[in-house]
Amino acid sequence: MESKPSRIPRGISVQPSSSLSARMMSGSRGSSLNDTYHSRDSSFRLDSEYQSTSASASASPFQSAWYSESEITQGARSRSQNQQRDHDSKRPKLSCTNCTTSAGRNVGNGLNTLSDSSWRHSQVPRSSSMVLGSFGTDLMRERRDLERRTDSSISNLMDYSHRSGDFTTSSYVQDRVPSYSQGARPKENSMSTLQLNTSSTNHQLPSEHQTILSSRDSRSSLRSNFSSRESESSRSNTQPGFSYSSSRDEAPIISNSERVVSSQRPFQESSDNEGRRTTRRLLSRIASSMSSTFFSRRSSQDSLNTRSLSSENSYVSPRILTASQSRSNVPSTSEVPDNRASEASQGFRFLRRRWGLSSLSHNHSSESDSENFNQESESRNTGPWLSSSLRNRCTPLFSRRRREGRDESSRIPTSDTSSRSHIFRRESNEVVHLEAQNDPLGAAANRPQASAASSSATTGGSTSDSAQGGRNTGIAGILPGSLFRFAVPPALGSNLTDNVMITVDIIPSGWNSADGKSDKTKSAPSRDPERLQKIKESLLLEDSEEEEGDLCRICQMAAASSSNLLIEPCKCTGSLQYVHQDCMKKWLQAKINSGSSLEAVTTCELCKEKLELNLEDFDIHELHRAHANEQAEYEFISSGLYLVVLLHLCEQSFSDMMGNTNEPSTRVRFINLARTLQAHMEDLETSEDDSEEDGDHNRTFDIAYFI
C-alpha cells in the first residue's frame, strides 16, 4: 500500500461513561461547563497562528483528559509526528497502545472543560505523524481504506466511527502541523490542536478502556500557564499504568487492554527492542526542540529522572508507578532523589554517579539562596534526559558532559579500595571513616551515596561547623598504605558536585600518618653558613705535597740536579715563571725544526716578550741557520731540478759509451760516473736524518753500479 502524507484531520468518536470522573492531568483545574460542546467548523490556516477547535458532544457527560509535559515524562506519552511536505513514504509512525488507567480525582458534578484558549499547543517535530488507535480489530482495515480515498482531499474533514460489541472506535483530528525540510527547529509557529468529537451510542465506554489524548507542549512561552504547584498536585493524583511502543509500520498497532495486562512483560520486551531501533532517529530530530521544554527548575528536577528513562528505553515502564506514588505520598523533596536513584540503577547506568551527586545537593537545603541556585542548576545539568546514542551523535552539544563523565569515571575508581576504610581528614581535625562498598555490582551507584552520607554526617555534627568548615576548609583524602594524597578544593567541603578538580601529590618516604607531618629536617642537608665558611677556608689553606719549591712550567717538576737548574726565560710569573734548562732546549729545538722563523723561536708564546737565554752549548742562531740550509737543499732535491741535471749527464755518458763499446776505456768511464754520483748522493744522505731515504738511495746506486 502506498502511504500518503497524512495531513488530514480526523474526527474522534468516543462514547463516554457517565460514572467516570473527569481528570485534568496538567494545569487548569478548570471550571464547570455545560453538558454539551458546541462544534465549530475547523478552518486551516497557513500562517503562523494555530487553529483552535471545539468538540461537540451529546447530552451525556463525557470525560476530557490529556497530559501535559510533566505528566508525559511520568506516564504514557503519545508522540505526535509530522509528515514531510515532499510526499515521501519514509515516515515512521508511532502506535500507542492504551492500557488501563486508574480513575482520577472527582472535581464535582459539573464537567471539567477546556476552553478554546486553554488548549495547549505543541509543535510536532519533522517527519512524524501520530496515530491514536482504539480497541477493535476492524479499525485497521478502515484506516487503510480511508488512506486510499484521501489522495487529493487533504483539507477535508472526515469523520468515521466503528461500532462493534463492547468497543468504541476513536480517532483524532489533527489540524495543520508544521513541516520543514532540514534542521531540528521548526521554521514556523503553526500549532496543532486535537478535537474530540463525541457521540452517544447504546454502549458505555468502560473506565479501563478510556482513551486518553495527549498533546505535548514544546513552546517555552506557555510555561507560565501551569505552575509547578498545580503540576505537583496533578502528579500526585496520576498513576499511569500503561506502556507505549514505537514502530515503523504503516498501520497502527491495536491492542486490547486485557491482553496488555495479561502479557505485560513480553510486550515490554518486544517494545524495548522495537523502540531502540527508532529512538536514535526520532530523538535526533527533536533534540533542539526538546531542549526548551523544561517548566521550572524544580519541576524539571522532579521529572528529570523519568524523562531520561523514557527516552532511553523508549517505553514507560510500570515501575514508574511506584515512583509517582512515593512522590505523592511523601511531600519531602529529600526523598525524591532516593526514588530516582533506585530507578536510575535500572535505567541509565552511566548516570548513577550524577544522580547520586544531585541527590546530595538536595540534602543541603539550609544553605543560602545562591547555593540553592547552584545546586538546582547543577542537578539539572547532571541528569541529561537524552539517550546515550544521541549523546554520542550530538558532539557539539554534549562533548563537555562526555569529558566530565570521563574525568569523573577516571577519578572515582582511584578511591575504590576493596575492604579497608578511607580516612578523610579535614583541617578542623575531624576524621570521618567512609566504609568502602563490598558489592561489586552496585559499587558505582553506592559510591556517591556513601560519600553523601559521610559528608552529611560531618556537616550535621554542629551547625557552625557545617556552615564555616564546609566552605572554608578543604578535604584531604589520605589513603592508608598509599603514596598518593587526594586534595579536594575547599569550596566543596559540604556539597560535592561533578565539577571537581583533584590534585595528586606524592607523599615522601618520611610521611607520618599519625600526625600528618614529614620529617624534612632529618633528610634535608645542612645549610649552616659557618660550616661552609670553614670548609672554604680549609680548602684555600690546604698545602700541596708538591709545593715545596718552584716547579717547571713544562714538566711540572722541581730542580733535580745542579746541571739542570730552573731559569727565568721571560717575564711570566706565578707557576709559569720557572723552566728547566733541558726542557727549554728541547722546546726551542722543536720550534726550530718546525720551520718557525727566528723571531718566533726567540719570543715567549705567553707573555710575548723576548726570551733572555744564557744556555750552555746551545746557540739559537747557529741552530736556526743550519736548519735553514738543510731546508734549502731539501727543497732543491724535492723540486726535481737535480734529477734533470743528473739525467742529462747520464745520457751523454751513455752515448759515448755506446759509440765506443769495444773500448775498455769506455767501461771505466761509465763506472767512474756511477761512482761519482754515488759519492755525491752519500754526501746528501749524511745531512738527512731519515734512514728510509738512505736505504732507497743506496739501492738505487747499487743497481746503477751493477749495470
From Swiss-Prot:
InterPro entries: RING-CH-type_E3_ubiq-ligase (IPR052297), Znf_RING-CH (IPR011016), Znf_RING/FYVE/PHD (IPR013083)
Zinc-finger ranges (RING-CH-type): 544-614
One GO BP annotation of this record: negative regulation of protein autoubiquitination
Pfam families found in the cross-reference section: RINGv
Record-listed Phosphothreonine modification sites: 686
GO cellular component, one term: nucleus
Protein name as annotated: E3 ubiquitin-protein ligase MARCHF7
Organism of origin: Pongo abelii
Gene label: MARCHF7
